Amino acid sequence: AVNRGFGGDTLNTSVYIARQTDASALSVHYVTALGTDAFSQQMLDSWQQENVNTDLIQRMADRLPGLYYIETDDTGERTFYYWRNEAAAKFWLESDRAAAICEELATFDYLYLSGI
């Protein structure tokens, strides 16, 4: 059986922090870029249900999200397959909103960063 989920180091961290904090006391934002496709929308909807603020996520009509697939063998060993060379997240700094998003991030108390 194939199970679909959304994850990655920065998203997992954002979701875990959002789950452990009072949303009125701490706003957890996630910054990335996604496409305008239905799969990207499902990702956004899922993150919003976890109380992760998605206002700073850019949508790129000509891009799709990066994907990875994890295969687990009978002993529990995992093998990872990645498709992210053309992922929207790889290009978000080239967008028109990038400078404004960076300025807004400069006002945040804490940042957790990662990259591909």
Regions found by a protein language model. Name each.
Residues 2-16:
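Short catalytic helix/loop segments, enriched in acidic residues and glycine
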Residues 13-26:
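A short, Lys/Arg-enriched amphipathic alpha-helix followed by its capping loop at the start of a domain
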Residues 25-115:
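Conserved N-terminal subdomain of the carbohydrate kinase-like
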